[in-house]
């Protein structure tokens, strides 16, 4: 069903028009006693919250200062109402675009009854908005006005902000939002902050051996240190026959021994990086018209990268490890709440506003069940 229009009137569509009838019709706060013609002039004062005969398109025939006649009262109206029926859903309801017949900025007392649902699927657009001048308007909410919840934070680090529920920016006088006990004006929740990347795993130190020989000689073993720092002898320098030999007569002998080459070894260490840290988890999405049920928890972080190890090397000096798991993303915000923070460098997303920005009063049943979010 479409948004419908109802009026208090038109009155005096035919027949005689008496002052007593006009008094009963238009001066509702004092329907007894006499009423003068001056009281029945069309009141165009935009700041008057209770005009006797209001300024309205339908009342344009009624004089405002002089030349008033009873005939001008014919087909006049007192109040002007619009109603969104229960069961209807309007996305991004443009209040000032409805069938006000030019009366939105006039001082006729008006009411917009929102009995269905207003919602938004975009955080950049409020669920319902009034962007033009309005006077003497009551928005009576017995249904729902739900802002858009922020999408999950898939890139980081900051969570996205939730969307507003009701936006009133046109200005004017006597603008009220009246909440029935069944009414709900809920701002969209912010998204959780993206989880931080997990830390890298412990590096491992692997080693290989480098082998070289150093020539020995007569009476001496080769010096492994001549190869450079870190070389040590692990073998060689075995006897390989005499040297520096001589004989006298029947005796022959060697004063020294030839030695085989010195067998040298050096341990060469290589640092192998630990496994890379796992990706941080996505921040949870915020509650909103676009996500009224379901989990708003942040996603689990990714597993850390595998550690390559010392395969292909001779051995291990110190052991390394796999990368650490990424941090779980922050939870999204419930209606009108911020997304949760993590240890990452950003913040969870802010919630939208229940009603924004200024220039209105909130009446009726106002509690944590009927409004979620700031106003």
Q: Where do the protein language model's features map onto the residues?
A:
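Glycine-centric low-complexity repeats
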Residues: 2-375
